From Swiss-Prot:
It comes from Psychrobacter arcticus (strain DSM 17307 / VKM B-2377 / 273-4). GO terms for molecular function: ATP binding; glutamate-tRNA ligase activity; tRNA binding; zinc ion binding. A motif ('KMSKS' region) lies at residues 261-265. PANTHER family: GLUTAMATE--TRNA LIGASE (PTHR43311), GLUTAMATE--TRNA LIGASE, MITOCHONDRIAL-RELATED (PTHR43311:SF2). This is Glutamate--tRNA ligase.
């Protein structure tokens, strides 16, 4: 293997990008990759831009896009071009660039580097099932790759739905150059004939990111290592178009303490959770900068400017960096200790004075207080991170501990999938689940008061869940399940099967 590439592709101005998909909450992994893209660009006198990959029209939302942009800005990242600030390569939302992708997909067909595939989803499912039964890797077998031009034109004329797939070699090895790994060899037999344009005319990630990176003059692509196996497809597309390929750098993925891929089922993963919990943006950015990377002087506490000034991408370690909340809290404490009392006062006021949240809290506690000082007792749980609870806190005359764990876990999974976080949707979900489990609503809700507020004596819990938001609610529910001892693998598997069979409680409303 070659030595890792240190090239910055100096013949081109350095331009990097982050391209989040607005399909959920702003993930710390997005901020992590964005940080290194920004730092690398600035360290080489270049530009960092942002674009939105919203080709998944069923899951992409304007609300999610706004949350992502707000969260990245809150943590201290900024971009010179993007959907909110404009720029010379607009538009920066892929959903607004469909004509561009269609033109390039047609260009690949004209050059015979791509073909139309008319296979139905049922045919593809059968094909994959047969391959798996034979111990083969499931991949498209090329059955439409050699259709005669006349046949293809006839099917298109008849209006038969089709996708556009890229052609790939059937033998040999693709050599991909990576800044951290040097030459990576991937057999072409492991590379699928990727769909480039879907039946609805929208591109897949693979076509859109290549076309956009070229048209937006991206010189370096720093992205998660989960994309390494897709690099041959992207490299091939650059060759097909006759374009210069950006330098690739596949960053190690963030891991849970047990070394598994960072996921919301084991750790809070949303930037907004850490903001609401009281982590300073400087501390979170500092911590993400330490993920798989060490400063030349081994400093643990450093600013973004200090990171940029001394950045050496070769200091990134390929071992999966552990995202440890306890270490983040320690680092946050270091930042807090360094503040003057006046600065700390202002930080606390900024953190606590989310006006929309405060108005909602005031409305919730207003019927319950006689003095302004009563607000402290009634509203404290809205601002804390995790309530001080133990297994005994959940003791209930009508429910066993096992029942409580299972209903909390089922509720957690249901709430994770809510399309919009609102009191109405929370109510419909929990009411439907209680009825499905044949548990009286009063009994069913008691453990939720404990999990969310730490007490059964609090403001209405579903209203409280709406106010503290999805991230904090889900984190407190996970904490409650853990406090109660959690679920073993067998019980978890059984419960997952039960969860898969639950009806859509929102549709029932």
């Amino acid at each position: 293997m070659m030595q890792p590439s240190t090239s910055t592709n100096s013949n081109r101005p350095v331009r990097t990008r982050i391209a989040p998909s607005p399909t959920g909450f702003p993930h710390v992994g997005t901020a992590y990759i964005a940080l290194f893209n920004l730092a690398f660009a600035k360290a080489h006198g270049g530009e960092f831009i942002l674009r939105i990959e919203d080709t998944d029209q069923t899951r992409s939302t304007e609300q999610s896009e706004k949350m992502i942009l707000d969260a990245l800005r809150w943590v201290g990242l900024d971009w010179s071009e993007g959907p909110d600030v404009g720029g010379p390569h607009a538009p920066y939302r892929q959903s607004e660039r469909s004509a561009i992708y269609k033109k390039h997909a047609e260009q690949l067909i004209d050059s015979d580097h791509a073909f139309r595939c008319f296979c139905t989803s049922e045919e593809l499912d059968t094909m994959r099932a047969e391959q798996m039964a034979n111990g083969e890797t499931p991949r498209y077998d090329g059955r439409c790759a050699h259709l005669a031009t006349e046949k293809t034109e006839q099917l298109v004329k008849e209006g038969k739905p089709n996708v556009i797939r890229m052609r790939v070699p059937t033998e040999g090895v693709c050599q991909v150059q990576d800044m951290l790994r040097g030459t990576v060899e991937i057999p072409w037999t492991q590379v699928d004939m990727q769909v480039l344009l879907k039946t609805d005319g929208m591109p897949t990630y693979h076509l859109a990111n290549v076309v956009d990176d070229h048209l937006m003059d991206i010189s370096h692509v720093l992205r998660g290592e989960e994309w390494l196996n897709s690099a041959p497809k992207h490299q091939l597309l650059y060759e097909y178009f006759g374009w210069e390929m950006p330098v690739l750098c596949h960053m190690p993925l963030l891991r849970n303490p047990d070394k598994s891929k960072l996921s919301k089922r084991k750790n809070p993963t949303s930037i907004t959770y850490y903001r609401d919990a009281g982590v300073l943006p400087e501390a979170l950015l500092n911590y993400l900068g330490r993920m798989g990377y060490s400063m030349p002087d081994e400093a643990e506490k450093f600013t973004l400017d200090e990171m940029i000034a001394s950045l050496d991408i070769q200091r990134v370690s390929l071992g999966g960096p552990i995202f440890d909340i306890e270490k983040l809290n320690w680092l946050n404490a270091e930042w807090l200790r360094a503040l003057t009392p006046e600065e700390l006062k202002n930080k606390i006021l900024d953190w606590a004075s989310n006006s929309d949240k405060l108005t909602a809290i005031a409305a919730a506690i207003q019927p319950r207080i006689e003095l302004l000082s009563d607000a402290v007792n009634w509203s404290g749980f809205y601002f804390q991170n995790l309530p001080d609870i133990n297994a005994e806190s959940f003791t209930h005359k009508s429910l066993t501990a096992e029942q409580i764990i299972e209903m909390l876990q089922l509720a957690l999974w249901q709430l994770e999938t809510l399309p919009t976080w609102s009191e109405e949707n929370i109510y419909a979900t929990l009411k439907g689940l209680a009825a499905h489990l044949d548990i009286k609503m009063r009994d069913f809700m008691a453990p939720f008061f404990i999990a969310i507020a730490g007490s059964t004596s609090s403001t209405p819990v579903m209203n409280s869940m709406a106010i503290i938001g999805a991230d904090m609610t889900l984190t407190r529910l996970r904490h409650a399940v853990d406090v109660l001892g959690g679920l073993g693998k067998k019980k978890l598997k059984k419960l997952e099967k039960q969860a898969a069979e639950l009806p859509d409680f929102l549709a029932a409303e």
